[in-house]
């Protein structure tokens, strides 16, 4: 049995030992929910790693976007080089779900670009969970979407052992059944090739290592790993387990049973639509479903096979899909990172998916079983939890109400204090900001400025550039990789000031930042809530000389709470430093290169419906209600740029009424 073992030159310090002991003991006692309330820069990831080492449980770490998941994965890999740390996120570089717009009679076909590297990492994660127990999977919220039945996935694996009597052609047939393709020329992931008594297999979870099976008659003589590029033998193996090339792979027997059920559901649906005098819809659903059935019979799958996953799994209507969480053993541990953002995301997933599916089913593009190809509802998600640790600097009400233990981690290992907060009047804020920026840059540090609107960000960026200050504007239409490049360039000193509406999304923990300026801090709303302000203040918590300037004419309730909490933490930190003779020191953090794998932007720029001139008054009112709901969800998830765009669109629509 492999054990989790941390490799790090550092030992837990400050509040870390107490937090590690408290939460580890709680887990071993069987406590279901706990919270790690750790301020920015207090080493929450290191604390999580130490807890994993203490409790020795397979662990799922849930992050609220792909970029944070990638950062956490690389950190955990540094801490656990001997153990298995996997990355599981949506494998789409681009994804346009199928949808139907009845107002314009427009059907939008599903269009997607799958990232082969991320697909490989997903297969690597699921296969690792069946092969070993020392596994950490860092995932985005895509892990609550249907993934295929883990029991079927395990049952379909092809087990090959040295000395086993097995016909080569029989193994090839088994590989085809689990979605592998024979390809003698282009040997890539999910393919195999046969040359005489040698069978080469390129596993779906592998990057550059293939499995070579050599036969002597009908007996497996040798199993060896080889480099698929050079052909060099790497090592000999006694046993190899080949997992399916698709998470939705199904045995032939099960597929035939599922097809019969799909045909029955099709007949029932056609009867319903015909009775409602929806003849076009009835013909459409019959034609589309029969085409899918034909494809499944011929090649074992079809485009959009996930829409039949409930039937393929043999689940009853309305029952939750199998997800990554079902691939874990029962006693797994879950960390929900930045839980104040991640949990609202989990809650919002089901509603958005359901509303899109309604039109597809209603207008005959899909059978009702498509409803069950969906993310988990929140209560279903809760039902799959074993033991959970919420991790956040600003845990929300849900986390605090459910937790039997809240471990505070306020003392930073570096001795750094929460930044000093200065409140200044709005009048003359730009001139004052310019002077503060100049002072900070002259010391060799960087500046973050957060504004309320896109226009203000653009105007401020132009103004600062005209004054000779190297400034960049970080906005929602910039994709993940570009955002990371901008952050890296800020750290390298290619520019000195970063302006934006939402500077929380990447967890911008940049040691070089010594000033965070919050413009119009007293304008109450989702952009200036207590959580948002505390998180923004935290951006200045990696530098010993940092400070925060809030420009405001009044102290709002949110400001008062954020300032009070920051001062409370600052007092505790100062007392600890005085007692132990610690001098605060700026974090020295390596500037890592951008992740090589190209990932899709989680929060792609939100596309609102600009073609509203032809809508009736009733349709406009309906659209306003829809946007208001989406704006609230976006605000809860701290996606402020998206929420601000929706707010602007709502105001435009109200003018049309």
Swiss-Prot record:
Which InterPro entries has this protein been placed in?
A: Helicase/UvrB_N, Helicase_ATP-bd, Helicase_C-like, P-loop_NTPase, UVR_dom, UVR_dom_sf, UvrB, UvrB_inter
UniProt keywords (A-Z) are: ATP-binding, Cytoplasm, DNA damage, DNA excision, DNA repair, Excision nuclease, Helicase, Hydrolase, Nucleotide-binding, SOS response
All copies of domain UVR, residue ranges: 621-656
Q: Which residues form the Helicase ATP-binding domain?
A: 25-178
What stretch of residues is annotated with the motif Beta-hairpin?
Answer: 91-114
Q: Which Pfam families match?
A: Helicase_C (PF00271), ResIII (PF04851), UVR (PF02151), UvrB (PF12344), UvrB_inter (PF17757)
> Where found, per UniProt?
Cytoplasm
**Which biological process terms from the Gene Ontology are attached to this UniProt entry?**
nucleotide-excision repair; SOS response
Q: Name the family the entry cites.
A: Belongs to the UvrB family.
Tell me what this protein is called: UvrABC system protein B
Organism listed in the record: Clostridium novyi (strain NT)
């Amino acid at each position: 049995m492999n054990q989790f073992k941390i490799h790090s030159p550092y030992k837990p310090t400050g509040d870390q030992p107490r937090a590690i002991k408290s939460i580890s003991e709680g887990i071993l006692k069987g406590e279901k929910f706990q919270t790690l309330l750790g301020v920015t820069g207090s080493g929450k990831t290191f604390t999580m790693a130490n807890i994993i080492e203490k409790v020795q449980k397979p662990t799922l770490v849930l992050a609220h976007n792909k970029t944070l998941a990638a950062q956490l994965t690389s950190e955990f890999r540094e801490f656990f080089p001997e153990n298995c740390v996997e990355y599981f996120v949506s494998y789409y570089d681009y994804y346009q779900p199928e949808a139907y717009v009845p107002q314009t009679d427009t059907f939008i076909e599903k269009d997607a670009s799958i990232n082969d590297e991320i697909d490989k990492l997903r297969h690597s994660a699921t296969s690792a969970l069946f092969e070993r127990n020392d596994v950490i999977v860092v995932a985005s919220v895509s892990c609550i979407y249907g993934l295929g039945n883990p029991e079927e996935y395990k049952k379909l694996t092809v087990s090959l052992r040295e000395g086993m009597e097995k016909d080569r052609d029989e193994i090839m047939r088994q590989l085809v059944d689990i979605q592998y393709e024979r390809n003698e020329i282009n040997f890539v992931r999910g393919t195999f090739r046969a040359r005489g008594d040698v069978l080469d297999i390129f596993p779906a979870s592998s990057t550059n290592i293939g499995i070579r099976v050599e036969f002597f008659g009908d007996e497996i003589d040798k199993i060896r790993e080889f480099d698929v590029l050079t052909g060099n033998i790497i090592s000999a193996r006694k046993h190899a387990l080949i997992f399916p090339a698709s998470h939705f792979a199904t045995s032939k027997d099960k597929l035939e049973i599922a097809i019969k059920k799909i045909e029955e559901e099709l007949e029932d649906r056609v009867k319903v639509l015909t009775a409602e005098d929806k003849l076009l819809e009835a013909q459409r659903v019959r034609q589309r479903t029969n085409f899918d059935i034909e494809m499944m019979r011929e090649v074992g799958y079809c485009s959009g096979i996930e829409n039949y996953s409930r039937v393929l799994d043999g689940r009853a209507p309305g029952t939750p899909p199998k997800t990554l969480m079902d691939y874990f053993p029962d006693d797994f541990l879950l960390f929900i990172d930045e839980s104040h953002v991640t949990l609202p995301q989990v809650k919002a997933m089901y509603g958005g998916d359901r509303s899109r599916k309604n039109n597809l089913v209603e207008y005959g593009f899909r059978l009702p079983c498509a409803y069950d190809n969906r993310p988990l509802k929140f209560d279903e998600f809760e039902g799959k939890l074993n033991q959970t640790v919420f991790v956040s600097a600003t845990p929300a009400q849900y986390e605090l109400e459910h937790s039997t233990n809240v471990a505070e981690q306020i003392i930073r290992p570096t001795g750094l204090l929460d930044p000093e907060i200065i409140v200044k009047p709005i009048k003359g804020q730009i001139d004052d900001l310019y002077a503060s920026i100049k002072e900070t840059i002259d010391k060799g540090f960087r500046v973050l400025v957060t504004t309320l609107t896109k226009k203000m960000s653009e105007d401020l960026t132009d103004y600062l550039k005209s004054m000779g200050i190297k400034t960049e504007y970080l906005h929602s239409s910039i994709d993940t990789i570009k955002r990371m490049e901008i952050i890296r360039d800020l750290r390298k000193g290619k520019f000195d000031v970063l302006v934006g509406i939402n500077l929380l999304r990447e967890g911008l923990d940049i040691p070089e930042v010594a000033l965070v300026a919050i413009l119009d801090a007293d304008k109450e709303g989702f952009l200036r809530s207590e959580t948002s302000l505390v998180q923004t203040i935290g951006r200045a918590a990696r530098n010993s000389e940092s400070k925060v300037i809030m420009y405001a004419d009044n102290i709002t309730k949110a400001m008062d709470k954020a300032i009070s909490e920051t001062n409370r933490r600052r007092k505790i930190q100062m007392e600890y430093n005085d007692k132990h003779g610690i001098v605060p020191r700026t974090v020295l953090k390596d500037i890592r290169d951008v992740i090589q794998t190209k990932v899709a932007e989680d929060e792609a720029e939100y596309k609102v419906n600009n073609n509203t001139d032809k809508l009736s008054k009733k349709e406009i009112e309906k659209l306003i209600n829809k946007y208001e709901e989406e704006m609230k969800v976006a605000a809860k998830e701290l996606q402020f740029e998206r929420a601000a765009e929706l707010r602007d669109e709502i105001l435009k629509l109200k003018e049309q009424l």
